[in-house]
């Protein structure tokens, strides 16, 4: 099953010399269970691509088509996208993600806070443990504070 399909995606910014295309006519398809890594030189459009997909491109314009689980997500309202997709089904790990952890809360407390903000009503302990183990971390990590983790561990959290 096609999970994410990006077709003809272009993202541009305006400049005094005209439009600057940070992403130009990108196509890719991800099947359910697949993942993708985006690599490239500084300022080549990696972050712009991600921001375009999650509809958070500030000061730019995006065209093309992005379908998630068969639904075109560029054409739906901002509130529908927020309620149904952004941070629920589609997320982005930003550069410097390690800096987003709150130093005064344990890793588990931070997971709990996120689940509460998203009105999760299931088994907190189970979903948190499943998330941690899915990135090859173990349960004792949940009792630690961010400064007690290595850089790689923070990035996986």
Feature-to-residue mapping (PLM):
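The feature captures the beta-strand-to-loop junction immediately N-terminal to the Walker
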Residues: 39-41
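ABC ATPase NBD coupling module
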Residues: 73-91, 117
